[in-house]
């Protein structure tokens, strides 16, 4: 399985957290979440981080520079997973469940809070380009239905608990690990 993980440019990472984190802290937090997601995914295949940031380096992972929007990301041929970088609670079990879903479906969609899509897994030979931003999960369901693509939905805490807003930090502070939890706890009273 090949995985694509989009990652925002320096200065554009987690800007909605600016009311509780300065830019340096947001940068460290975003990088800590990215490293966590890459660490989990790398147990299942090759991971490629796609970013406009030409200075980004993630040890053991290919980094591709691209200015493409989320909806225009370069996607691999064959079977792939597209997973967001802001999932501090993502676990191997979450990814296993998503991959298991591909046994009976062409596409697996993983919803995030507020109706977003935090993971998309596509079976080899299936042409499906997801859409992102805002309430993208129902849009992706409709798109798949329109294309006649068989969809499985995997609901799990790891995919659901993305971090976009200050109130999302509590999950990372209480349930996260390592640097992600440490940074979240420095901002949220627990």
Swiss-Prot record:
For this protein, the record's Pfam families field holds:
CofC (PF01983)
**Annotated pathway:** Cofactor biosynthesis; coenzyme F420 biosynthesis
* InterPro entries per record: CofC, Nucleotide-diphossugar_trans
EC numbers listed for it are 2.7.7.68
Q: Which GO terms describe its molecular function?
A: GTP binding; phospholactate guanylyltransferase activity
Q: Name one GO biological process term.
A: F420-0 metabolic process
Which chemical reaction does it catalyze?
(2S)-2-phospholactate + GTP + H(+) = (2S)-lactyl-2-diphospho-5'-guanosine + diphosphate
- PANTHER family per the record? 2-PHOSPHO-L-LACTATE GUANYLYLTRANSFERASE
User: Matching NCBIfam families, A to Z?
Assistant: F420_cofC (TIGR03552)
Its biological purpose: Guanylyltransferase that catalyzes the activation of (2S)-2-phospholactate (2-PL) as (2S)-lactyl-2-diphospho-5'-guanosine, via the condensation of 2-PL with GTP. It is involved in the biosynthesis of coenzyme F420, a hydride carrier cofactor.
Which family does the similarity line name?
Answer: Belongs to the CofC family.
Q: How does it assemble?
A: Homodimer.
Q: Which HAMAP family match?
A: CofC
Report the protein name in the record.
2-phospho-L-lactate guanylyltransferase
């Amino acid at each position: 399985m090949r995985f694509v993980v989009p990652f925002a440019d320096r200065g554009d990472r987690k800007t909605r957290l600016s009311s509780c984190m300065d830019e340096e802290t947001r940068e460290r937090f975003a990088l800590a979440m990215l490293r966590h997601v890459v660490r989990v995914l790398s147990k299942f295949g090759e991971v490629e981080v796609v970013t406009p940031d030409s200075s980004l380096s993630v040890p053991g992972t290919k980094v591709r520079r691209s200015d493409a929007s989320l909806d225009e990301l370069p996607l691999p041929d064959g079977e792939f997973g597209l997973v967001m970088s802001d999932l501090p609670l993502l676990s191997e079990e979450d990814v296993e469940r998503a991959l298991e879903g591909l046994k009976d479906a062409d596409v697996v969609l993983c919803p995030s809070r507020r109706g977003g899509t935090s993971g998309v897994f596509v079976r080899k030979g299936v042409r499906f380009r997801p859409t992102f931003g805002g309430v993208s999960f129902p849009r992706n369901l409709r798109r798949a239905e329109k294309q006649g693509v068989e969809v499985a939905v995997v609901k799990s805490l790891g995919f659901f608990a993305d971090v976009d807003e200050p109130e999302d930090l509590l999950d990372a502070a209480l349930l996260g690990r390592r640097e992600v939890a440490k940074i979240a706890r420095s901002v949220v009273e627990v």
